[in-house]
Regions:
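Short, threonine-centered small-residue motifs that mark membrane-proximal processing/anchoring sites
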Residues: 1-24, 160-184
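Mature extracellular "passenger" or substrate-interacting domains of secreted, surface-exposed proteins
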Residues: 23-163
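C-terminal membrane-anchoring or membrane-association module
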Residues: 182-195
Length: 195
């Protein structure tokens, strides 16, 4: 009976602990443009102060229109040249990106073509790498930062994570240690004889 109680307690502990958040998303420069107003709803909910990590590959490109408007998630912040193997399909050395300045929208000024996150109506530049506290409470949305969407193309893969380890993970680990300790303590001692 005691073993069943320990098993039930362990199952309840696991059921009430939430795992760390980690997921991958594809953000489209046209359909998720801030100019169109439709960010990608990740379905991930954060509270202000929760650890939020976001990353995108530096060689994953998207475009704000005619050349030179290709960039990675950091946006159109400087000269960028084709590698010959990137998404543009252009010969190596062709200028594909340049500094286009900042676009101001929703109370945030960020580079054109950058990856921006929105939580609870508050916006933050994420770029290729962000790690810090969530700036508001709500569901995370991801945007391609631009004033319009009609000439945008391309998409990038974005990895989003949360606090690791979370307090729930620690609680689950400590609960597991307690269950193992309780199970070992209740075992009967075996008499060993030699001879």
């Amino acid at each position: 009976m005691r073993g069943f109680t320990m098993l039930a307690a362990g199952a309840a502990l696991i059921a009430f602990c939430s795992p760390a958040t980690a997921a991958s998303f594809v953000v489209d420069a046209a359909s998720n443009s801030s100019g169109a107003g439709f960010g990608l709803n990740t379905g991930l909910t954060y509270f202000a102060g929760d650890l939020l990590t976001v990353s995108a590959a530096a060689d994953d490109l998207w475009s704000a229109g005619l050349l030179p408007r290709w960039s990675n998630a950091n946006g159109l912040i400087g000269d960028l040249f084709a590698t010959g193997t990137d998404e543009t399909g252009l010969p190596a050395g062709t200028q594909i990106g340049a500094n286009w300045g900042l676009w101001a929208q929703f109370g945030l000024s960020a580079p054109y073509g950058s990856l921006v996150g929105g939580i609870g109506g508050v916006y933050q530049l994420l770029g290729t790498s962000f790690s810090g506290p969530a700036w508001a409470s709500g569901t995370l949305e991801l945007f391609y930062w631009d004033e319009n969407s009609f000439d945008n193309s391309g998409r990038i893969s974005v990895n989003v994570g949360g606090a690791v380890p979370e307090p729930a993970s620690w609680a689950m680990m400590l609960g597991g240690f307690g269950l193992v300790g309780g199970a070992l303590r209740s075992r009967r001692k075996l008499a060993v004889s030699f001879g």
